[in-house]
UniProtKB/Swiss-Prot annotation:
GO terms for cellular component: adherens junction; cell-cell junction; membrane. It is found in: Membrane; Cell junction, Adherens junction. The keyword Membrane applies. The gene is tmem47. This is Transmembrane protein 47.
Length: 181
C-alpha cells in the first residue's frame, strides 16, 4: 500500500497480510492443542484396564474395581518425551508472543524469520517426541490386551501440524505478494 506525502515522496506502509494473520491463528491453535496434549489423561488406553498419560500410568486388574496409579517420570524415555513436548510447546508460546507483538508494532518483517525458525525448531522437537513415544511404549510396556493411542497423542500431532503450517506461512516472502492486498 503506497501513499504520497508532499507530492513527490512515496512512503511504504507495512500492512498486515492475510497469510501472516492465518499464520498467527495457526500458531495460536498449535499452542492450544499443545496445552491440551500436555494435560491430557489419555495418551494410551486399553479396554478400560490401562491408561497412560505423560504424567501417570494407571492400571486396573480385571477382578478389581480400584485403579493403581504410578508416576511415569521414573523412566528415561517418558522424561525425554515430556521434555521434548514441553520444549516444543515453549518455543510455540515464544513464537506466538513474538508474532503477536509484531502485529502490534510497525516493523513486522524483521520478526517473520525468528518466528519461522522457532516454529520449525518446535516441529522438530515435537516430531521427535511423537516418534519416540510409540516406539518406546511398544518396546517397554507389554500389554496383552488391545490398546490404542488416544486423543492426547492426537492433539500433540495436531499441534505439530499447525506449527508446521504456521512456520511455512511465516517463511513466505511478503514482498512478492503484498502489492496485491
Amino acid at each position: 500500500m503506497a501513499s504520497s506525502v508532499s507530492g513527490a515522496e512515496e512512503v511504504r506502509v507495512s500492512a498486515l497480510t492475510p497469510l501472516k494473520l492465518v499464520g498467527l491463528v495457526c500458531v495460536f491453535l498449535a499452542l492450544c492443542l499443545d496445552v491440551g496434549a500436555v494435560l491430557s489423561p489419555a495418551w494410551v488406553t486399553a479396554d478400560d484396564q490401562y491408561h497412560l498419560s505423560l504424567w501417570k500410568s494407571c492400571s486396573k486388574p480385571a477382578a478389581s474395581a480400584t485403579w493403581r496409579c504410578n508416576s511415569t517420570l521414573g523412566t528415561d524415555w517418558q522424561i525425554a518425551t515430556l521434555a521434548l513436548l514441553l520444549g516444543g510447546a515453549f518455543l510455540i508460546l515464544l513464537s506466538f508472543l513474538v508474532a503477536l507483538v509484531s502485529v502490534c508494532i510497525r516493523s513486522r518483517r524483521r520478526f517473520y524469520r525468528p518466528v519461522a525458525i522457532m516454529l520449525f525448531a518446535a516441529v522438530v522437537l515435537q516430531a521427535c517426541c511423537l516418534v519416540l513415544y510409540p516406539i518406546k511404549f511398544i518396546e517397554t510396556i507389554s500389554l496383552r490386551i488391545y490398546h490404542e493411542f488416544n486423543w492426547g497423542y492426537g492433539l500433540a500431532w495436531g499441534a505439530t501440524i499447525f506449527s508446521f503450517g504456521g512456520a511455512i506461512l511465516y517463511c513466505l516472502n511478503p514482498k512478492n505478494y503484498e502489492d496485491y492486498y
